[in-house]
Amino acid sequence: MTNESILESYSGVTPERKKSRMPAKLDWWQSATGLFLGLFMIGHMFFVSTILLGDNVMLWVTKKFELDFIFEGGKPIVVSFLAAFVFAVFIAHAFLAMRKFPINYRQYLTFKTHKDLMRHGDTTLWWIQAMTGFAMFFLGSVHLYIMMTQPQTIGPVSSSFRMVSEWMWPLYLVLLFAVELHGSVGLYRLAVKWGWFDGETPDKTRANLKKLKTLMSAFLIVLGLLTFGAYVKKGLEQTDPNIDYKYFDYKRTHHR
């Protein structure tokens, strides 16, 4: 470790007596990774909800992710690489966000007192985002690891099997609320922080963005619950012990 690094770590300024730009750079990367994950969250919800349109529609979309228009039957390993990339961004975002978390009881008490006294909506939203982010770090990691290591088990039949027979439904139910709340709040706070849509009336814009955030949360949660119900219903109907439901979708597209 150089003397310059030691000086900056204690004083917060560079050897040139300038305030360190590192916090700003880390904030930018936190925002960038958060934006990517927020948009991915929306796309992911629309993907998994294709089961509401029928098995064939979801299977068709699944195979497009596996590049079946290039490889006959598709290559599940393509999904593994995609999941690994998202997992890496997910971990990086969590690492960057942890800088803002209260790290001891005193900091937690200070924040809680501030939140309760101020009763400011955006402060409460930050707290919701922090709590849902904490839950997502564990629940989301489980889901992403499964997608990364078992991509051939994605599909209307196989995913329903995982949901019910492999008892993933409690995790997915909690993850649904955590992801949709965290993502919608995060996108709202990004827009406010960077002033993307401020225009000439920032206060009015912020109020409209908050309404949009609420509508987004409600829409995605309702869509998610309908999708969740569809998977559970299909999973409960899988009662034939002679059928390999876990790899059913993979086998019917790779063994003809």
Curated annotation (Swiss-Prot):
Keywords: Cell inner membrane, Cell membrane, Electron transport, Heme, Iron, Membrane, Metal-binding, Respiratory chain, Transmembrane, Transmembrane helix, Transport, Tricarboxylic acid cycle. This is Fumarate reductase cytochrome b subunit. Its cofactor is heme b. The keyword Cell inner membrane applies. GO terms for cellular component: plasma membrane. The chain crosses the membrane at residues 31-52, 77-98, 125-149, 166-188, 207-230. Changing residue 114 to A: Slight reduction in fumarate reductase activity. Heme b bP binds at residues 93, 182. Residues 1-30, 99-124, 189-206 are cytoplasmic. The keyword Transmembrane applies. GO terms for molecular function: metal ion binding. It comes from Wolinella succinogenes (strain ATCC 29543 / DSM 1740 / CCUG 13145 / JCM 31913 / LMG 7466 / NCTC 11488 / FDC 602W). Its main location: membrane. It is a multi-pass membrane protein. The fumarate reductase enzyme complex is required for fumarate respiration using formate or sulfide as electron donor. This subunit anchors the complex in the membrane and binds a diheme cytochrome b. Belongs to the diheme cytochrome b FrdC family. It is found in: Cell inner membrane. Residues 53-76, 150-165, 231-256 are periplasmic. GO terms for biological process: tricarboxylic acid cycle. InterPro entries: Fum_red_B_TM, SQR/QFR_C/D, SuccDH_FuR_B_TM-su. Heme b bD binds at residues 44, 143. Binds 2 heme b molecules per subunit, called the proximal (bP) and distal (bD) hemes. CDD domains: QFR_TypeB_TM (cd00581). Part of an enzyme complex containing three subunits: a flavoprotein (frdA), an iron-sulfur protein (frdB), and diheme cytochrome b (frdC).
